[in-house]
Amino acid sequence: MAITQNYGTGRRKSSTARVFLRKGTGNITVNDRPLDEFFGRETARMIVRQPLELTKNTESFDIMVTASGGGTTGQAGAIRLGIARALVEYDETLKSELRKAGFMTRDAREVERKKVGLHKARRATQFSKR
């Protein structure tokens, strides 16, 4: 018998996360490492667990994640979106609850490009009156 699993893709900044949800005991592995080992910061771990805590599914699933690109904050946000999408694939009734909490919305903010003639995206050289 094939293992039933639910899948969700999440993106944030330049990070992408592929999330696989299986019935289990609440183990979360990111790139073959436990969640606590992969993310050093507690805030990143908290962000990843938010959809599960909201839907009271913390101990119901084993989650396997492949995260690539970007930094830790971007990857944590991508994983959160992926978990939320996978939960909706598992149970459609959770969608309104997750949407209300803002976990179903892709954060569209991206890094603004650097412009020619400026130091950074908006930082210009100091203005001299004389």
Curated annotation (Swiss-Prot):
InterPro entries: Ribosomal_Su5_D2-typ_SF, Ribosomal_uS9, Ribosomal_uS9_bac/plastid, Ribosomal_uS9_CS, Ribsml_uS5_D2-typ_fold_subgr. The gene is rpsI. One of its GO terms (cellular component) is cytosolic small ribosomal subunit. It comes from Xanthomonas euvesicatoria pv. vesicatoria (strain 85-10). Belongs to the universal ribosomal protein uS9 family. GO terms for molecular function: RNA binding; structural constituent of ribosome. Disulfide bonds: none annotated. Keywords: Ribonucleoprotein, Ribosomal protein. This is Small ribosomal subunit protein uS9. Pfam families: Ribosomal_S9. GO terms for biological process: translation. The keyword DNA-binding does not apply. The keyword Mitochondrion does not apply. PROSITE patterns: RIBOSOMAL_S9 (PS00360).
